[in-house]
C-alpha cells in the first residue's frame, strides 16, 4: 500500500512540469522598412470649431522615431483545440473604443465573441459610429456627447473590420473579432506578445492596414498573410522583424 502511495505521489510530481510545458509565449518587435512617411494632415470639414483644433493626421501608419511600427496585427485564424485556462477570466473584461478629439482611441482593437464592446464618446459633440462586417450584424449608431453603446458579437471575422463615423468621414478604426484569445497588436514601440499559446506549429495571419502583410524581414508569407511559426514551451522571441512599406 505504501509503495502505491509513493508511486502515485511521484507520478503527480513528474506530471506537473509536463503540464507546465504545454504552453509558450510568442514575442516580437516590428519595424517599418525604409523611411517613414510623413503623416498626412486631415482636412476637417465638419464641426470645425472643435475638431479643427486637434491637429489631426492620418493614422494609416503610426511609426516611431526609430521605425517602430504600431498596429501590426498577428493572430491565429483557426480556433485551437486547447485554450489556456487563464484566458477564461478575460471574457468578463470589457473592450473599450472611445470617440476622443474627433478620432478613435484605439485605432486597432481586438475582441472575442461573447465579450462586451463599449464604444464611448468623450467629445462635446455627437458621433455616429458605423461598423461593417462579413459575419456579424453591421451597425450605424448615433452616440451623443458623453454617451456610449454596447455591442456583443457572436461570430469570428477573418480580418479586422472597419469602423467609421458617418458624421466625420476622416475617422477610421479597425476591430478584430475572434472566437479565441490568440491575437496581438503591436504597440507604439512596435512590440507584440501573445501569451500561453499551445505548443506546436501554428499558422498565424499578419495584417497591417489596409491589407495582409506579404513579407517579413525578407521572408515571403503565404497568400492571405499566412506565417508558419513553431511555438516551443516557455518564451519564444522572434526578435526584431521588418515589414516593407
Where are these regions (language model features)?
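Extracytoplasmic copper-binding redox domains, predominantly the cupredoxin/blue-copper superfamily
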Residues: 19-245
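Positively charged n-region of N-terminal signal peptides that target proteins for export
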Residues: 1-4
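Bacterial N-terminal signal peptides
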Residues: 7-15
